[in-house]
Amino acid sequence: MSQNQDRKDNDVITLVDDEGNETLFNILFTFDSEDFGHSYILLYPADAAADDEVDIQAYIFNPEDGDNGELQLIESDDEWDMVEQVLNTFLADDGGMQ
């Protein structure tokens, strides 16, 4: 899956799937993990309504790739556990995504 960052608003990116379909996503936040040596990006659909339950997606990314970098799938259960802990902490501190 590739990432194409919208130059007008750095909080929105377009993901292009293997079939060429484009979907807009808002960036919830990014963070780095020294333990796993990766940077992570957490996204949710740009068309999600404020009162909807939102499907948050997480990927590994390389911030040095710029606007057209490739997002990588998180394959390790240990990495997923860490990402979920970071997300839960973010949501608890932020009071949700409101």
Curated annotation (Swiss-Prot):
Query: What are the transmembrane regions?
Result: none
Q: What HAMAP family does the entry give?
A: UPF0473
Signal peptide bounds: none
Q: What is this protein called in UniProt?
A: UPF0473 protein lp_2273
Query: By its UniProt entry, which InterPro entries does this protein fall under?
Result: UPF0473 (IPR009711)
The family this protein is said to belong to = Belongs to the UPF0473 family.
NCBIfam families documented for this protein: PRK13678.1-2, PRK13678.1-4
- Output the Pfam families linked to this UniProt entry: DUF1292 (PF06949)
